Amino acid sequence: MRSALPLVLFSLVALCGRGDCRVANAEEKLMDDLLNKTRYNNLIRPATSSSQLISIQLQLSLAQLISVNEREQIMTTNIWLKQEWTDYRLAWNSSRYEGVNILRIPANRVWLPDIVLYNNADGSYEVSLYTNVVVRSNGSVMWLPPAICKSACKIEVKHFPFDQQNCTLKFRSWTYDHTEIDMVLKMPTASMDDFTPSGEWDIVALPGRRTVNPQDPSYVDVTYDFIIKRKPLFYTINLIIPCVLITSLAILVFYLPSDCGEKMTLCISVLLALTVFLLLISKIVPPTSLNVPLIGKYLMFTMVLVTFSIVTSVCVLNVHHRSPSTHTMAPWVKRCFLHKLPTFLFIKRPRQQPSRAPQSSLARLTKSEATTTTTLAMGPTSSSNLYGNSMYFVNPGLAAPKSPVASDSAGIPRDFRLRSSGRFRQDVQEALEGVSFIAQHMKSDDLDQSVIEDWKYVAMVVDRLFLWVFVVVCVLGTVGLFLPPLFQTHTPSEEP
């Protein structure tokens, strides 16, 4: 055992003789020399005089855009805030310490400018991890702490879901003002070298700006504008396209026949479906009264159109079920809706086929009835006009005056034939009056049915007119609502 002890000591001496051990000893000695309590106090600002400004260079690196909560108006990001300044007390001559030029020191042992996120939304102002600071031999200090920031973000819902937001991250020292430190931008924009793309937002620009207040010389801050644009595919698939399809169902209302009885049911069903979508939107966007979201405007627009279709359906049904006993068709209605509008609306009314005797037959029947009535009124001598050449009970010889007791060649008394012909004339007259009544009644029914068909045709023309109005207004309204947000431009806010 004693013989092995010299060998161990020799090995330790050999290892310490290597460069690594010398460097380790040099860094340890340098750490002790720099952070000696009699020489360095991490609570004191590294300034040679009380009037000297310590310049703090800031550079933001965006690692990930975690989320944007529209309802709570909070943006969550994963950032690295690079801070650089010069501390003359941490400078050394590298030749005296084995050529050591860089030294890593725990952040709690050196002075920090206590720069925090001013527009913090969760009350946690500390960084996620207090990493070491990197100190160089010339006294320059670099600190790159990672942080999960939850910042307040004013959400503009005007163009939702085709919106573009400008969320800001404002950094400022918590205890030092502009008379003690000066915050400057190392680069005009934030870095995205290590950025992980987001599935919901596109990064448009990340400009930074230094803000001072001329009226307050002690104020200075550095603000980064996160100009982000939403990827609308999710909301297009789940909100906009279903709304458009449901709205297009309202067009079918104008194609449903009025006798179907389902026009009002379809209209109200579409209206209820749009109301459900409106309730879904209210749970996504913030409850603000400053602006109405674009999708909300579209839903309200479609709800107005569907309500209009309900009103028009009521009017069309009212016109469709009119009859001559309740309404009289005005001449301007006939002229406008039966002759002029159908041509412009590409409607051609089919030619109506008469289902009963034509008007000329009815006229001949009426004329024959009048002739028969006159003949019967004139007596038996004119009955030949009714029966043509038939001489059943009247012959030409009866025209001459004879004795009332005379008999014909058959031996039948002539007064008996006259009495028989009088009873026959009465029966025929009653039969003809019945036929005339039936003919007039059928004619009246045909006229009433023709008027009813005219009212139904007017209802169809009105329905087609409202259909074209609905389609034109729906298309123009949809294009007018969704087209402007696609070409919107956004400029960073210049407010301090």
Curated annotation (Swiss-Prot):
The chain crosses the membrane at residues 237-257, 266-286, 299-319, 465-485. Keywords: Cell membrane, Disulfide bond, Glycoprotein, Ion channel, Ion transport, Ligand-gated ion channel, Membrane, Metal-binding, Receptor, Signal, Sodium, Synapse, Transmembrane, Transmembrane helix, Transport. CDD domains: LGIC_TM_nAChR. One of its GO terms (cellular component) is neuron projection. Its main location: membrane. Gene3D superfamilies: Neurotransmitter-gated ion-channel ligand-binding domain, Neurotransmitter-gated ion-channel transmembrane domain. GO terms for biological process: acetylcholine receptor signaling pathway; chemical synaptic transmission; membrane depolarization; monoatomic ion transmembrane transport. Na(+) binds at residue 262. It comes from the Eukaryota. It holds the Pfam family Neur_chan_LBD. It is a multi-pass membrane protein. Glycans are attached at residues 36, 93, 138, 166. GO terms for molecular function: acetylcholine receptor activity; acetylcholine-gated monoatomic cation-selective channel activity. It is found in: Synaptic cell membrane; Cell membrane. The record marks 82 as: Key residue that facilitates effective access of the conotoxin BuIA to the channel binding site. It catalyses: Ca(2+)(in) = Ca(2+)(out); K(+)(in) = K(+)(out); Na(+)(in) = Na(+)(out). InterPro entries: Neur_chan_lig-bd, Neur_chan_lig-bd_sf, Neur_channel, Neuro-gated_channel_TM_sf, Neuro_actylchol_rec, Neurotrans-gated_channel_TM, Neurotransmitter_ion_chnl_CS, Nicotinic_acetylcholine_rcpt. Residues 258-265, 320-464 are cytoplasmic. Residues 1-19 form the signal peptide. Residues 20-236, 287-298, 486-496 are extracellular. Disulfide bonds join 153-167. Belongs to the ligand-gated ion channel (TC 1.A.9) family. Acetylcholine receptor (TC 1.A.9.1) subfamily. Beta-4/CHRNB4 sub-subfamily. Component of neuronal acetylcholine receptors (nAChRs) that function as pentameric, ligand-gated cation channels with high calcium permeability among other activities. nAChRs are excitatory neurotrasnmitter receptors formed by a collection of nAChR subunits known to mediate synaptic transmission in the nervous system and the neuromuscular junction. Each nAchR subunit confers differential attributes to channel properties, including activation, deactivation and desensitization kinetics, pH sensitivity, cation permeability, and binding to allosteric modulators. Neuronal AChR is composed of two different types of subunits: alpha and beta. CHRNB4/Beta-4 subunit can be combined to CHRNA2/alpha-2, CHRNA3/alpha-3 or CHRNA4/alpha-4, CHRNA5/alpha-5 and CHRNB3/beta-3 to give rise to functional receptors. Forms stoichiometries such as (CHRNA3)2:(CHRNB4)3 or (CHRNA3:CHRNB4)2:CHRNB3. Interacts with RIC3; which is required for proper folding and assembly. Interacts with LYPD6. This is Neuronal acetylcholine receptor subunit beta-4. The gene is CHRNB4.
